[in-house]
């Protein structure tokens, strides 16, 4: 579960390393986000010479959470980190590579490009 002030790692090659969530999109008073949800973030840490600068406000989709995901068949899944992928306004990833596995729920939510770029879909 991701909420306001949560810090996430960035799992793509856009140049941002860490972001801080300050809004969960989808509803007037929505508090928590999970895998596949879109959040609005502020960039907190960047690599040198990257196109994204510190303090930029961006949209991102969550691809991994430490909180377990319960699937319809009863199985659960959780990851070691809270991670996201930076997207543009149309929902396409800004980066050209994605690092680490992503959950299958990403494809179910309509982010097919992200799931195809990922090295492993769990």
From Swiss-Prot:
Q: Which Pfam families match?
A: Ribosomal_L14
User: Coiled-coil stretches, from where to where?
Assistant: none
Give the superkingdom in one word.
Bacteria
One biological process term in Gene Ontology:
translation
Q: Which Gene3D superfamilies does the record match to this protein?
A: Ribosomal protein L14 (2.40.150.20)
Disulfide feature: none
Keywords assigned: Ribonucleoprotein, Ribosomal protein, RNA-binding, rRNA-binding
List cellular component terms (GO). Answer: cytosolic large ribosomal subunit
MF annotations from Gene Ontology: large ribosomal subunit rRNA binding; structural constituent of ribosome
SMART domains on file: Ribosomal_L14
Known function: Binds to 23S rRNA. Forms part of two intersubunit bridges in the 70S ribosome.
Q: Which family does it belong to?
A: Belongs to the universal ribosomal protein uL14 family.
> What quaternary structure, including any partners, is listed in this protein's UniProt entry?
Part of the 50S ribosomal subunit. Forms a cluster with proteins L3 and L19. In the 70S ribosome, L14 and L19 interact and together make contacts with the 16S rRNA in bridges B5 and B8.
Q: Which named protein is this?
A: Large ribosomal subunit protein uL14
């Amino acid at each position: 579960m991701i909420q306001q002030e949560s810090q996430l790692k960035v799992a793509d090659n856009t140049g941002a390393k860490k972001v801080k969530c300050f809004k969960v999109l989808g509803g007037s008073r929505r508090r928590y986000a999970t895998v596949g949800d879109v959040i609005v973030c502020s960039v907190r840490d960047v690599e040198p010479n990257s196109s994204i600068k510190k303090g930029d406000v961006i949209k991102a989709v969550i691809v991994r959470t430490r909180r377990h995901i319960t699937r319809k068949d009863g199985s659960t899944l959780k990851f070691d980190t809270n991670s996201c992928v930076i997207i543009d306004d149309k929902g396409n990833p800004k980066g050209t590579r994605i690092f680490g596995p992503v959950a299958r729920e990403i494809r179910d939510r309509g982010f097919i490009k992200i799931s195809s770029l990922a090295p492993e879909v769990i």
